[in-house]
């Protein structure tokens, strides 16, 4: 098993010297990176990549035997269908196994139920392209309770088996839940 580097936190280092950055993480034993990808919004100033940034990075990633197995994606919360084709193409072209989303901004039961419907639909579309969908937790969706569960647990259960979890144990701990007990 190899560990990966979540690129959001090291975006400055990546921008300053991509090759030097990859040399360092390779020497440290990392073999994967996990970029944050904005599909229709250019937020590169905030550490996000666009699909063309991923394409440009691939030759350098291949040179250092670094894979992109998962990508955090930031989509229009109510119009995922516009991104289906783009995500399917990325999955097939770069062998991305997982696309990672987060909980909605508003963590009320009705919003979580609506989001679960959209996430199931997105997961079904990604499955056709050979990829899956994971939900990444943050502090807020651990702190807020819905029907006696964390909002994160509620959303995962509402999504069903087609959608998995990418548990951020740091945020879980900050939210007051023991990650070991949760897992």
Which residue ranges define each predicted feature?
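N-terminal pre-domain/capping segments
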Residues: 1-93, 97
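Conserved Rossmann-like nucleotide-binding pocket used by diverse enzymes
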Residues: 4-6, 134, 166
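Short, function-defining helix-loop hinge/capping sites that tune catalysis or transport
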Residues: 14, 42, 144-145, 174-176
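Active-site acidic/histidine proton-transfer and metal-coordination neighborhood
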Residues: 32, 60, 64-67, 76-164, ...
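Short, glycine/acidic-enriched loop or turn micro-motifs at the edges of active sites
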Residues: 37-39, 139-140, 169-171
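Extracellular glycoside hydrolase catalytic/binding regions
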Residues: 161, 169, 182
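A short alpha/beta connector and helix-capping loop motif
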Residues: 176-183
């Amino acid at each position: 098993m190899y560990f990966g580097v979540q690129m959001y936190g090291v975006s400055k280092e990546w921008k300053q010297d991509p090759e030097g950055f990859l040399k360092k993480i390779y020497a440290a034993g990392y073999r994967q990176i996990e970029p944050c990808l904005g599909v229709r919004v250019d937020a590169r100033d905030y550490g996000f990549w666009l699909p063309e940034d991923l394409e440009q990075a691939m030759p350098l990633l291949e040179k250092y035997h670094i894979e992109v197995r998962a990508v955090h994606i930031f989509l229009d919360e109510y119009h995922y269908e516009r991104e289906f084709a783009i995500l399917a193409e990325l999955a097939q072209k770069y062998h991305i196994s997982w696309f990672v989303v987060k909980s909605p901004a508003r963590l009320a039961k009705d919003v979580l139920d609506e989001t679960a419907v959209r996430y199931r639909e997105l997961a079904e579309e990604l499955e056709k392209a050979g990829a899956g969908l994971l939900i990444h937790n943050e502090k807020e969706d651990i702190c807020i309770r819905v029907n006696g569960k964390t909002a994160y647990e509620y959303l995962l259960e509402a999504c069903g088996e087609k959608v998995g979890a990418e548990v951020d144990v740091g945020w879980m701990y900050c939210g007051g839940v023991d990650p070991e007990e949760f897992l």
